Amino acid sequence: MRPEPGGCCCRRPLRANGCVKNGEVRNGYVRSSTATAAAAGQIHHVTENGGLYKRPFNEVFEETPMLVAVLTYVGYGVLTLFGYLRDFLRHWRIEKCHHATEREEQKDFVSLYQDFENFYTRNLYMRIRDNWNRPICSVPGARVDIMERQSHDYNWSFKYTGNIIKGVINMGSYNYLGFARNTGSCQEAAAEVLKEYGAGVCSTRQEIGNLDKHEELEKLVARFLGVEAAMTYGMGFATNSMNIPALVGKGCLILSDELNHASLVLGARLSGATIRIFKHNNMQSLEKLLKDAIVYGQPRTRRPWKKILILVEGIYSMEGSIVRLPEVIALKKKYKAYLYLDEAHSIGALGPSGRGVVDYFGLDPEDVDVMMGTFTKSFGASGGYIGGKKALIDYLRTHSHSAVYATSMSPPVMEQIITSMKCIMGQDGTSLGKECVQQLAENTKYFRRRLKEMGFIIYGNEDSPVVPLMLYMPAKIGAFGREMLKRNVGVVVVGFPATPIIESRARFCLSAAHTKEILDTALKEIDEVGDLLQLKYSRRRLVPLLDRPFDETTYEETED
């Protein structure tokens, strides 16, 4: 699933020889430019880009140790050799498990998959398939109940045992602010709306599916974002994939970060616009593409582009990195381009008021032309939104496929969003929303800091609630997920093709619902599994100078 020349996908490229622009590499340790400035004592609003930041911007990607990279490639090589051996044994009917053998009646069918994808699925993915699609039978809160299952045919099929694994610490759900629960004011309000309006609308917004709740929600979203108007949609993925084609088309240019989500990739490809990819969060790469676009224009004709649209995300969900929004906005203004910001993971999770990456950097929402986000994460609901100028929203109401053809959002879902958003804004008469935002920030710093102290390689920004812990080797993907579940901790493990082939990882998502006791329990188990599987690859560790309170951030870097 590597991207085509005009495409991109949600993963980070390999760093050749540890060379990274916008940052510095020393002893294989990669730090962003602002983190380097902070280490040198320039900790207030100073970057290499002219002081665009109003706060320190600390983002770290430690380079893969050479020995680990070699052993990872060797691991994949051994698995590949055994895969070919198993294919040989299947061909001659020697292997007992025949699930991967093509049936006689399908011999002449056209292949559904490419050879490598098929080989990878049956010989590598199947070995660790039990780590995914685990069914839960409770609210995805700080703890979940998981249905136990077993496989007697090497993970080709599963049978439920009837047992429930109760009270598993949930480190995988996008429940950033803890609103995914079945009790409380949000749920009570949603239940009342369900009684009054029912579960569904059974129509589109343009017909008879436009409820007063839709109008109330869109006005509230616009106030929350600080924009003129907003429009909501029933599906977050479709908010991107169906609206980008309405904004750009042939004769337009899309500049997309190489790690953008699949929904942005699909929307860009469906639009028919020309697509160019810039290196992840690399402003030199983006500026070069902008300059080339203006100087050379469209291919063959050399006519000016009708529009140039920059696509970025607030928080990148596989890397835990935060977009360099001040620099992106500066380039956008300099070269007269448009900016499309996907805040699926950052809205509610970043900023002193929970208003996302724009709030996090203290920027003006009017500097972002198209503000997109979802309600599936911080708000504990479903759907998405687009915010911006009123003229933009009026245009999308008549030209967006999601607006014209999709069924309207469910009333109880809207009420969940309305109630939780008012809570974040403090309009419910309590400080609960603000406390949740602060608690998430504290949990994030604490969890990241403790993992680094243990010696794990952790990617991303220190303020990002998405925390990737690097596993690297394919065998350790399955082993880590299984060992953590044995210890009553549910985690998400990720490998190729969602990541580069040697950068498999576990991804933790922090929540305001996590108490310090829950985090300490999870960290204790992670530490034990890290020792068991020898996952502590970092050559630099953070060591506490003193025993400090929960929210302190002063730590010393040491090198092994």
From Swiss-Prot:
One of its GO terms (cellular component) is serine palmitoyltransferase complex. Keywords: Acyltransferase, Endoplasmic reticulum, Lipid metabolism, Membrane, Pyridoxal phosphate, Sphingolipid metabolism, Transferase, Transmembrane, Transmembrane helix. Its main location: endoplasmic reticulum. Its EC number is 2.3.1.50. One of its GO terms (biological process) is adipose tissue development. Its cofactor is pyridoxal 5'-phosphate. Disulfide bonds: none annotated. This is Serine palmitoyltransferase 2. It comes from Cricetulus griseus (Chinese hamster).
